[in-house]
């Protein structure tokens, strides 16, 4: 399991203390959304592996020339790799939409070339997408990518053996459609009515599995069945809006942590996921819930108790689904 380290706040602890908090909780993977030299340097010798993001503003520049990508790699990857920091993934932007999304693939290609030239080809380059890059998401087997550019990205990921990074939020699907989606089903709790995918017979007992398998179905239809999904963000707010309570947030995030060892009905086995987020971020724009996704307050006190080791759940029931809107 990993945890996303966002910094849209004015009251967060020093970077080194953040890394110490990750280590003390046994969190072995970190996602950051831009190059933070202090945080990356603090990872040296920590055993924590990094998903490093480019900013969305970087993407057009990286797409524009190989030399820009080469400069970015030499400034932002090579020094830290040489110092012993394990960078696993580079995320080319986060939830880029509209016309800017057309630059993602060129930026990924240039970064792949720059990494290979720097003998850093083991670092996988991808992009982090919103769930709504797919449409027809229920039943999961009917899902397809909504835009042609995603088909091209999927095929490129297959050619480089890189995963698709997907931000998957049952919270938003549930809060947008509580009439049809039950809270237990959205939060990994027992008692949810299983729902069968008529397209392939698989049965779903939680919304997260259905959403991830919808991504897999879209990848298959794009001609990229070998691409695995890494859940690059998932979480539940503890305050600020509908169903946003510490109890629900704890149920969801603990359920997610316990769940990742078992995979989904379509892709059983270990999966990789990053909880959003480490801290409540008091300067995040948008709805009030956006400022309450943290596992910890800025003073490092937990918002609710989480066991990061996980392991509570039984394996996935592979013959067992529930509907959800296209969020």
Curated annotation (Swiss-Prot):
Pfam family membership, one: Glyco_hydro_17
GO biological process annotation, one example: defense response
Glycosylation sites: 317
UniProt GO molecular function: glucan endo-1,3-beta-D-glucosidase activity
Any single Gene Ontology cellular-component annotation: vacuole
EC number(s) on file: 3.2.1.39
Record's subcellular location: Vacuole
Gene3D superfamilies (alphabetical): Glycosidases (3.20.20.80)
Tissue specificity: Aleurone layer of germinated grain.
Reaction catalysis annotation: Hydrolysis of (1->3)-beta-D-glucosidic linkages in (1->3)-beta-D-glucans
Active-site residues, Swiss-Prot/TrEMBL: 95, 233
InterPro entries, per database record: Glyco_hydro_17, Glyco_hydro_17_plant, Glycoside_hydrolase_SF
UniProt keyword terms in alphabetical order: Glycoprotein, Glycosidase, Hydrolase, Plant defense, Vacuole
EC class (word): hydrolase
Top-level division of the source organism's lineage: Eukaryota
UniProt main location, coarse: other
Sequence similarity: Belongs to the glycosyl hydrolase 17 family.
UniProt xrefs under PANTHER family: GLUCAN ENDO-1,3-BETA-GLUCOSIDASE BG1-RELATED-RELATED
Job of this protein: May provide a degree of protection against microbial invasion of germinated barley grain through its ability to degrade fungal cell wall polysaccharides.
UniProt name for this protein: Glucan endo-1,3-beta-glucosidase GIV
